[in-house]
Regions:
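Non-catalytic terminal extensions of ATP-dependent helicases
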Residues: 2-5, 9-21, 332, 351-352, ...
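Conserved P-loop/Walker A NTP-binding site and adjacent catalytic elements of P-loop NTPases
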Residues: 65-67, 72-250, 256, 274-299
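Conserved C-terminal RecA-like helicase domain
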Residues: 121-123, 131, 138-147, 283-357, ...
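Compact beta-sheet-dominated globular domain cores
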Residues: 852-893
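Conserved interdomain hinge at the start of the Helicase C-terminal
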Residues: 254-280, 287-290, 344-353
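Conserved two-lobed SF2 helicase motor
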Residues: 158-174, 329-343, 349-369
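Helicase-associated low-complexity/disordered flanking segments
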Residues: 1-84, 88-92, 297-328
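Conserved segment of the helicase C-terminal RecA-like domain
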Residues: 374-377, 381-383, 389-430
């Protein structure tokens, strides 16, 4: 059938704007959403009347069909077929192409389920996608009918429709089994079933929820007959495959030997924008964007429109300044290392049709809503964390499938660039033309040694090859076993059934059984689990075996096995610290950091810096080159308290065996920032990680959340309270979305609350802002003590203190004093002052930082005015009237 409303059915839930167009009206519709209002209510009517009875499957289908018709949506054949199968109680595996309306079918399933009184789940692999779907469903079904659970976020958890990560549902299935209140589940991005680390969470619900209806959807499923047969066997319901729908927008393919710049220019001339240029590293994406920015990508009208659309965005960070220039040229950048506000801006500009070109990574395949006409692959190989290899068919189709905008394009375009040596050879051949003599003289370039290459045949095979059959992944962990034991009864038998009925090979099942035996033995030996034989009833046959019951002897921590599984260890480990120690606060921070996920790009930068310092020191000490190379392998980033934490964790695991599923990772990121008195911008500059500032921000947001949520009040000294305030201030100022999301968790009114108006306070977080200023000024003291004049010039050139002026000031200082001290006294409050007298009227603080000298004269320092509005907007201190020198001279100025 034809799709009569432009792109509506294909983007009902996943589109940024389409879902909101389905809400509105007055009265009930405005409150619950236009579709949610058609379902019998799950809540007690306020007027005391009898609620409408639950609908039959046919009635629910009819209401959904009428709802789509009222909005001018004519269902495609495969959509109607899938919805009718769901109404009949069948499972559906929906493997139709990108843009073929899977989201609308999922919406229909969720509505029909809730209208029949069933609790429904929508699962996705990443929190960002769960959050996006949650807000879209709220618009259509109404805020009272939709909840969200993502480990660190709990909103309206009693709602009839729950959006959650796959692991949330899997853990519920293990904990509650057949008795779980799960009527139907729409599993998005089901190809994650084959993910080596996370695939278990997609398989477990299929094996443990026999009364649940499933819809499994992905554009790159491959052969799923084994999964369908397993689902039918476990549930007794039919499983229908809907996998042969045509692409709404067909794809054309081209393998090119032109340079990337030439390819883009030709595509633009042919009217094939917008283009998404796929790279397999963040650095490569930025390099291409910077190269293309000089090619006149955008028209004057587009540049003006981009400038207008982006004017509300602050580009205060180092990468932000780069991005602002690129966007002004019509070129976007999109990858996971960016701040959320920058990624969202690029997506919004793309959705408005303002960006002709986006340079990004292969994250294009999951969870971003960017309309694209042409996908350009810069390579057909990628580094998978272990080695360079060619793309798999599923990876290729995930990326290529995003080309073509339904309702806008008659076709989508997928272009693959040849390897560099092949492009060079093509240039030589073109230059030689048809001259046989010149052609014979050509010395063709070869691929570099060890280079994993590709060619046109590689591209054609990827186009023709169906996605690989999903390889099932099941694992057995302490956490999973604990969850199964929570049900009571014979938990070991249930784990055996889980393994035996899985889709793993016989060899894999045997290994999993051995692993399960080991875990049960560990849990029983440690006293966490007890195994009891219950004698048969008196009237049972004489040969009846006793029933087996497994039970927990401990209370599990709240949110067990969710997003912060090591929080209980952290609470126990804090007892090892001496509150009277000078290093107490920093050591506590190191313990928190050891429980957080590694920000790998940041740690790699730390390791590079540590090795550079070590190499310079060894060279200065006269160590031979070969020995330097050998020794440098042992140098890595700082790991505070590593020995103490390792010993404590080993002991903890003996008492809490499920902790063996996880591992500590000592590191010093937040601690290093604090000890070097760095703000966000300064730390990025120090490590040279401008392209990974989003990674650093997410890490700091997690550290803030852990410090604020997990560390007991009685363990917080004054300094730690200051640090928590400062950290929250920094994260909010740089990009508030990461903190706001979890702080609003559990508060449904936050979804439609207006922003606060008329706040009298000039400074929203006085403690945090004060520490930000103190750290910024003491960082300058530290740099001055180390004679890092160039760094000082880079920090302060905007306020008139260039490198040359700093050098003159320090030369004058050293004529009077030997050194600049940076000990505890030098950092104390006595050496720093704030005059807040002009805060209300001028929105400035007058600040003064004294340099501590060996004679105790305290006659040299920094004075300046802090622009409070700009500082709070950007998360870094913005100065006015900034000066450095002897106090007498500064006061005269």
């Amino acid at each position: 059938m034809a799709q009569t409303t432009t792109d509506t059915a294909t983007s009902t839930v996943s589109g940024a704007g389409a879902a909101s167009s389905f809400s509105g009206g007055t009265g009930t519709e405005a409150e619950f959403g236009s579709l949610g209002a058609l379902s019998p209510t799950w809540w007690e009517p306020e007027d005391g009347s009898e609620p409408e009875p639950w609908l039959t499957p046919d009635q629910a289908f009819e209401r959904f069909f009428e709802w789509t018709s009222d909005r001018g949506i004519e269902l495609w054949d495969h959509q109607e077929e899938a919805l009718m199968d769901l109404a009949a109680g069948d499972h559906i595996i929906l493997g139709t192409p990108t843009g073929s309306g899977k989201s609308l079918v999922a919406l229909g399933m969720l509505f029909m389920g809730m209208a029949q009184g069933k609790r429904c789940y929508y699962t996705a692999p990443i929190k960002a996608l769960v959050s996006e779907k949650f807000f879209d469903l709220v618009q259509v079904l109404g805020r009272d009918n939709v909840g969200m659970i993502t480990g660190d976020t709990h909103i309206n958890t009693k709602a009839p429709v729950i959006c959650c990560t796959a692991e949330i549902l899997a853990n519920d299935a293990l904990r509650e089994g057949e008795g779980a209140d799960v009527g139907c589940v729409a599993m998005d991005e089901f190809h994650y079933f084959a993910d080596p680390d996370r695939g278990w969470a997609w398989q477990v619900p299929l094996l443990t929820l026999p009364h649940t209806q499933f819809m499994l959807m992905s554009a790159t499923l491959g052969d799923v007959t084994a999964i369908a047969a397993s689902l039918e066997e476990h549930t007794g319901a039919a499983c229908d495959l809907v996998v042969d729908a045509p692409r709404p927008v067909p794809l054309s393919y081209d393998y090119v030997t032109t340079s990337l710049e030439g390819t883009v220019e030709l595509a633009m001339r042919r009217g094939e924008a917008p283009l998404y240029i796929v790279h397999f590293s963040q650095d490569a994406a930025l390099a291409t964007a910077q190269s293309l920015a000089n090619f006149g990508i955008a028209s004057k009208e587009q540049r003006e429109a981009i400038k207008e659309a982006a004017k509300a965005t602050s580009f205060s960070t180092a990468f932000g300044k780069i991005l602002k220039r690129l966007l002004g040229c019509g070129v976007g950048v999109h990858h996971a290392g960016m701040l959320p506000r920058y990624r969202l801006l690029v997506e919004r500009l793309a959705q408005q049709g303002l960006l002709p070109v986006i340079c990004g990574t292969d994250t294009l395949g999951v969870g971003i809503n960017v309309p694209i006409h042409t996908v350009v692959l810069t390579a057909l190989t990628k580094f998978d964390g272990y080695k360079m290899r060619r793309l798999r068919a599923r990876e290729f189709h995930q990326i290529a499938g995003r080309a073509g905008r339904s309702g806008f394009d008659t076709e989508g375009m997928v272009i693959a660039e040849a390897p560099e040596h092949e492009i060079e050879n093509a240039k030589l051949m073109a230059k030689a033309g048809d001259d046989p003599k010149k052609l014979r003289k050509i010395k063709k370039k070869k691929a570099p040694e060890g280079f994993v290459t590709w060619n046109k045949q590689t591209f054609e095979r990827l186009i023709e090859t169906q996605p690989e059959t999903l390889k099932p992944r099941l694992r057995i962990t302490h956490s999973m076993v604990i969850s199964v034991v929570e049900q009571g009864g014979d938990a070991r038998a249930r784990v055996h059934d889980l393994i035996e009925t899985s889709l793993q090979t016989p060899e894999e099942k045997a290994k999993l059984e051995v692993r399960a035996d080991e875990i049960f033995a560990t849990l029983i030996d440690s006293g966490v689990v007890v195994r009891t034989e219950v004698p048969p009833a008196p009237d049972a046959p004489t040969d009846a075996a006793p029933d087996i019951d497994y039970a927990l002897t401990v209370d599990l921590p709240e949110d067990f096995a969710l997003d912060q599984p090591l929080s209980p260890f952290l609470l126990a480990a804090l007892e090892l610290l001496d509150p009277e120690s000078e290093t107490y606060t920093m050591d506590l921070i190191s313990m928190v950091e050891a429980t957080l996920e590694d920000p790998k790009q940041v740690l790699r930068a730390q390791e590079r810096a540590a090795r550079d310092r070590a190499m310079a020191e060894m060279k200065a000490d006269g160590v031979e080159y070969e020995e330097r190379l050998e020794r440098i392998q042992d140098v890595t980033y700082e790991k505070p308290l590593e020995d103490l934490l390792d010993a404590a964790f080993d002991k903890y695991c003996q008492e809490v065996p499920w902790a063996n599923d996880y591992q500590l990772s000592p590191k010093s990121v937040l601690r290093d920032m604090l000890e070097s008195a760095s703000d966000f911008k300064g730390y990025i500059q120090k490590l040279g990680i401008a392209r990974s500032e989003g990674i650093l921000l997410r890490y700091l947001a997690e550290a803030y959340r852990s410090l604020d949520r997990t560390v007991p009040i009685e363990k917080r000294d004054e300094r730690l309270r200051d640090i928590i305030s400062w950290l929250g201030f920094v994260v909010r100022s740089v990009d508030s979305s990461l903190v706001d999301e979890w702080e609003n968790a559990g508060n449904p009114t936050a979804l439609d609350a207006a922003p606060p108006q008329g706040i009298d306070e000039v400074v929203a977080d006085r403690r945090g802002c004060t520490l930000l200023v103190r750290n910024a000024l003491f960082r300058r003291v530290t740099l001055a003590a180390r004679e890092h004049v160039r760094d000082l010039g880079e920090l302060d050139d905007d306020w008139g203190m260039s490198e040359i002026r700093w050098q003159k000031a320090l030369d004058a200082y050293h004529e009077q004093h030997e050194e600049i001290l940076t000990d505890g006294d030098a950092r104390s409050a006595a050496m720093f002052s704030i005059d807040e007298s002009d805060e209300k009227t001028a929105h400035i603080w007058h600040v003064h930082q004294i340099f501590a000298d060996e004679d105790g004269d305290h006659d040299f320092g920094i004075m300046g005015d802090v622009d409070l509005d700009a500082t709070q907007d950007g998360g870094e201190v913005i100065f006015k009237n900034y000066r450095v020198g002897f106090i007498e001279d500064l006061l005269e100025d």
